[in-house]
Amino acid sequence: MQFASFISLDWGVVFQIVNTIVMYLILKKLLFKPVTKFMNDRQESIANSIKEAEETKKEAYALKAEYEAKINASKEEGQEIIKEASRKAEMRADEIIKNAQNEANRLMEKAHIEIEREKQKVVNELKDEISNIAILAASKVIEADIDKNKHEKLISDFIKEVGEATWQN
């Protein structure tokens, strides 16, 4: 009997064990499964958010690289446009300078021609004037009774002297 008292069960402990098992099963059914489901859903949601953020980050880097490439291309195109405009302006300036030099040369040539023409006109007027003076002098000499040969020689010598003197100047 002693053995029976040693094996005797304390029904209070058995009820506590049964209650703990029942409580565990109820909590597992009502609390652990929803909490576990909630935790798994939350973990999946966070993983999806991280994945979307990484994809968005990759897209942002791709767009950034694309925009930087476009900006660099625009800068290069702008520099090319500026170089081309500068080259055209330089060519236009050279053309204007060349035209101005040609016009100046043309005006100088025209002025030289006009000066030569005026010089020739003055020389011709002087020759006419000298001829008139020579004729006047000749008529005065004739009045002084010089023979005809001497008179002609005197006039031609006078014209030669005056003509050579004016041509040499």
From Swiss-Prot:
Main location: membrane
Keywords: ATP synthesis, Cell membrane, CF(0), Hydrogen ion transport, Ion transport, Membrane, Sodium, Sodium transport, Transmembrane, Transmembrane helix, Transport
Transmembrane segments: 5-27
Alphabetized InterPro entries for the sequence: ATP_synth_B-like_membr_sf, ATP_synth_b/b'su_bac/chlpt, ATP_synth_F0_bsu_bac, ATP_synthase_B_chain
BP GO terms, sorted: sodium ion transport
Molecular-function GO term, any one: proton-transporting ATPase activity, rotational mechanism
Keyword Cell membrane appears in the UniProt entry: yes
Pfam families reported in the protein's UniProt record: ATP-synt_B
Subunit comment: F-type ATPases have 2 components, F(1) - the catalytic core - and F(0) - the membrane proton channel. F(1) has five subunits: alpha(3), beta(3), gamma(1), delta(1), epsilon(1). F(0) has three main subunits: a(1), b(2) and c(10-14). The alpha and beta chains form an alternating ring which encloses part of the gamma chain. F(1) is attached to F(0) by a central stalk formed by the gamma and epsilon chains, while a peripheral stalk is formed by the delta and b chains.
Note: The ATPase of C.paradoxum is of special interest because it uses sodium ions instead of protons as the physiological coupling ion.
Role according to the record: F(1)F(0) ATP synthase produces ATP from ADP in the presence of a proton or sodium gradient. F-type ATPases consist of two structural domains, F(1) containing the extramembraneous catalytic core and F(0) containing the membrane proton channel, linked together by a central stalk and a peripheral stalk. During catalysis, ATP synthesis in the catalytic domain of F(1) is coupled via a rotary mechanism of the central stalk subunits to proton translocation. Component of the F(0) channel, it forms part of the peripheral stalk, linking F(1) to F(0).
Protein name, UniProt field: ATP synthase subunit b, sodium ion specific
Organism (species): Clostridium paradoxum
